[in-house]
């Protein structure tokens, strides 16, 4: 349970915070994911094998947009490879026939992932790093369930499932996170992240 993901947007009285609740199996697989965005009154729900609901209605990915959405958090702004990553994403968008890349700093990890899912094709990712910090399993568990049930892609930077039941730490920094609305986009993101390791 993360009763307040996106503390900074909340303190600033800006959109981008949420309540996030998940149930994770012993093997680390997300079973239930619930996210509530109180600013826009949106409730996302997913249960393994039962799809995704948005405000009580069954919801499916709509990849008809002509724009690629990339949501990022504060840590991305100071990354030395920021400009290269943005250019690579823009080039990828054009290569698959999209008109442009839309870049948004929206809020906490939970809302960033939801925003990318809702604005398909979209993505949100976190670089891996050796030092602890930068997100815990409760920042990723609910949205991992949403993505899996929507048929989208969620993984670590190497393409493996997120380590949501890590015995030695709640932090996810060691393997990063990739959220993408389709497999091709996820693969491109993993290539970008591999160049930064």
How does the language model describe each region?
Residues 1-53:
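DPxDG-like acidic metal-binding loop motif
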Residues 24-28, 39, 48-51, 57, ...:
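Short loop segments at secondary-structure junctions
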Residues 34, 58-62:
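A generic local secondary-structure boundary/capping motif
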Residues 40-44, 55-58, 162, 167:
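Short small/polar-residue motifs
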Residues 44-47, 56, 81-85:
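A short secondary-structure junction signal
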Residues 62-197:
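An extended, acidic
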């Amino acid at each position: 349970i993360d009763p307040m993901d996106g503390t900074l947007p909340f303190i600033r009285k800006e959109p981008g915070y949420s309540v996030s609740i998940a149930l994770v199996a012993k093997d680390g697989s997300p079973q239930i994911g619930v996210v509530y965005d109180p600013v826009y009154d949106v409730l996302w729900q997913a249960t393994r094998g039962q799809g995704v609901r948005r405000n009580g209605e069954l919801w499916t990915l709509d990849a008809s947009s002509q724009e690629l959405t990339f949501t990022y958090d504060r840590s991305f702004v100071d990354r030395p490879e920021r400009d290269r990553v943005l250019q690579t994403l823009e080039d990828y968008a054009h290569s698959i026939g999209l008109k442009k890349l839309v870049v948004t700093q929206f809020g906490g990890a939970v809302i960033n992932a939801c925003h990318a899912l809702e604005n398909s094709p979209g993505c949100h990712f976190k670089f891996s790093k050796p030092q602890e910090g930068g997100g815990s399993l409760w920042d990723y568990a609910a949205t991992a369930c949403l993505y899996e049930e929507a048929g989208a892609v969620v993984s670590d930077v190497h393409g493996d499932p997120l380590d949501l039941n890590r015995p030695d730490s709640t932090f996810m920094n060691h393997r990063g996170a990739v959220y993408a609305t389709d497999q091709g986009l996820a693969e491109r993101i993993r290539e970008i992240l591999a160049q930064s390791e």
